Amino acid sequence: MKFYGMLFDKNADSLFTRIEQDYQHLKAVAKKLPQGLSVLTERKTGSVWYVPGGRSTIGILLKDANARYVFEDDLHSGSLAMSPEQILSKGKDIDVWAFKYFGGAPLTRAQLLQEYDGYKALHCFVHPQIYEVDTSTEPYFELTSFHPEILLREFILLSHPADHAKFSKYAKDIRKLGALRFYHRQLQ
């Protein structure tokens, strides 16, 4: 952000400082909560399921959200190309599944099963905790690149649902964070 400010002769310091303060505040809020639910991101593409490495931006955001990320111990800073079988063996007990897609209409569980029947082995598929963001209608990439605090807030809310028994003691604090901005719960 500061780099773009220098390119266009704008002062980006105050905006960067505000974003950093918001991020650190949200990180502190998440740290006070019990560890969140387990989260799996993305979905199968062809014969590969790409997931963020444990040291990737998304991996760090999930850690800062105090979520349990399946690949949090991984040392890669980029994407991991895994077979669906590897994902299912490591992540079959996942609580929350959050992914991005480009489509114009919400994906249904039936459509996901047409894409890959193995999804039904995921705990979060059987006990639906599926969240999706349609990048054709939401400015996800445009905003989250410069506003990581928005994505951190999303991951806190996804991994600490206020209506979950584990977090009922903290429901008031969680609800103060507001509603999800990008991710929408899949209802079908």
Residue ranges of predicted features:
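Structured C-terminal subdomain patch of bacterial secreted/periplasmic proteins
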Residues: 1-11, 18, 99-188
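Basic- and aromatic-lined ligand-binding clefts that recognize polyanionic substrates
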Residues: 11-65
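Short helices/loops that flank or line small-molecule/ion binding pockets
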Residues: 82-93
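His/Asp/Glu-enriched short active-site or ligand-binding loop at hydrolase and phosphoryl-transfer sites
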Residues: 58-79, 98-101, 132-134
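Extracellular/periplasmic catalytic domains that process cell-envelope and extracellular macromolecules
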Residues: 32-35, 63, 89-91, 122-126
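Active-site rim elements
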Residues: 46-49, 70-75, 138-145
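Sec/Tat-exported extracytoplasmic proteins
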Residues: 4-11, 23, 27-30, 43, ...
